[in-house]
């Protein structure tokens, strides 16, 4: 009986052993056949480490080859990919990087390539690099990676044209807004950095290393070198840009401190070549330092931008929509000449108001008497142009506004351009659901009412006048250059198109604008320049405060090479608020070409660093 029980126990034990063996065998088969790839990756991950070599972004040069944007050497902190991480490691990283653990986990989850380390934070400052190095013995899966850092050496200079870069977001990756991009990469977020990102970004390289359990490198494998991004050569003139920005800031401060315009804190200035549309300078105030975004903008700097009522991040040259004021009289005059509604020397009487709408007259109630076109434009007389508006009619004013480029985007190579608005019966019906009145036509004729324009649109209109009737698409990038200096391509642009306005009409407009800057005109101080300039003042009504001041000009009159448009928000009269900035642009332009001496070229004083 006892032997039988012993045999039974042995049989039971044997069955249990067989079952256990079968389970182990099944598990082994499962791991080998179904989970083999996974554990092979885990094993390789423990000894193989792949890292990206970030491609340096292309350099951005001014028209003369001066570096406006370049790269500096820097560091990023990356995390070796593995199946799980110790909570204390993540917490240590969180404390070091000032990054929530949840954000670190989100980056880990977003990473798809098992062999590629996870980028946690780039553009580290030296203090952060030192702290991480000191803590690495507790975190062997954490590494420092050398990478290029985007650098804007002149800080705010031309920031609204150049833009800035930042780390690509999960949303941008999910939406496919950037091609061939991975988490942790830097991409253009605004300006030319964004428009030409696919050229500037280049192609990242990679290298593979074998490491031991402590993370020490024991073997190097062949690497794939990065391909640098393409370079951009701009049309921007560094010297003109620098002088315009400095003087604009100085002049705005003067307008405020003198009490002339206490609220003058915002402005837009653009200078272009009327012969082809090349932008020579672009200023929008207030501005900001794009370097703030490279290292991850601090809450202090972000609040200083975000809470500023003058919107520093808006490029007012292309997004600001303002009534064109008296600068629009160029359009009204052109329509009247083209439709034979007025003669060049035909006198029209200004008795201080228009008899058909007695409540509408000149600023300050001025009475200028009998006027012909040239004097009316030079004196910026309202009553004269009310009469032209009455003769022409709103439909024709609308037609010629579109001919000169209003109400449509210019096509400049920057994102976010506004279309503006052209006054019309349809627009009033859509906005106010009201019928059109004669007073609306009078307002439209002098650039008020429903008319809205951007400074870049005004520069296109003025270029048409300056060059004799051709409308060009404005642009900032002259050419895209390979890293070896050879030409990659010229950006495609629309060819210049001659507008449907006669040369005679263009000549009449030019005569009136030339008189504006001569004795008796509203901007006679321009007569002090070595070559004659043609200009037009403007005052744009502003329902939220003091009127905006505008000034537009081109020169030299005989052979125009430069068009300048300026608007100073809440600056008051254009001749006082905006005119001096335009004057400075031409002064710098003439000094560069040797037409007048440059004061700062005198012999330097002792102890002066040149």
Features from the language model and the residues they span:
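Periplasmic/cell-envelope proteins involved in peptidoglycan metabolism and beta-lactam response
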Residues: 1-297, 321, 395-405, 527-529, ...
